[in-house]
Amino acid sequence: MKYNVEVLVTLKENVRDPQGTAVDTVLKRTGLEDNAGVRVGKYFTLTVSAKNDDEAKEKADRICGDVLSNPILESYKIGRFEKL
C-alpha cells in the first residue's frame, strides 16, 4: 500500500532563525506587523510504501529523523497521513 505523508520541519525554539528575523524586519518596516515572531521552516510531501499503517508511520518517522531534518537543530511534525 502507498501512503501520502505531509511533514513540517522547523528550527528548535532555542535555535536562532535569521530568515524568520529578516521576514519580521520587513513586516515591521512595511507597517504590516510590529512583532509577528516569524519562524521559517520546510514543508515536505512524500509517498511511502508499506504493508500497513503502523509500518508506514514508522518508515515516515525514520525518513524524517534520518533524512529530512537535522535532529540537533530541527524538530519535525508529521501532519497529514493518508492511505492512497
Task: Annotate each PLM feature.
Residues 3-5, 50, 56:
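Long alpha-helical scaffolds
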Residues 9-13, 50, 82:
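Non-catalytic surface loops within mature trypsin-like serine protease
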Residues 14-18, 53-58:
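Short, conserved charged micro-motifs
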Residues 33-39:
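N-terminal glycine-rich anion-binding loops that anchor highly charged ligand groups
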Residues 39-52:
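Short, charge-patterned binding micro-sites
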Residues 57-83:
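C-terminal structural segments of small proteins and small subunits
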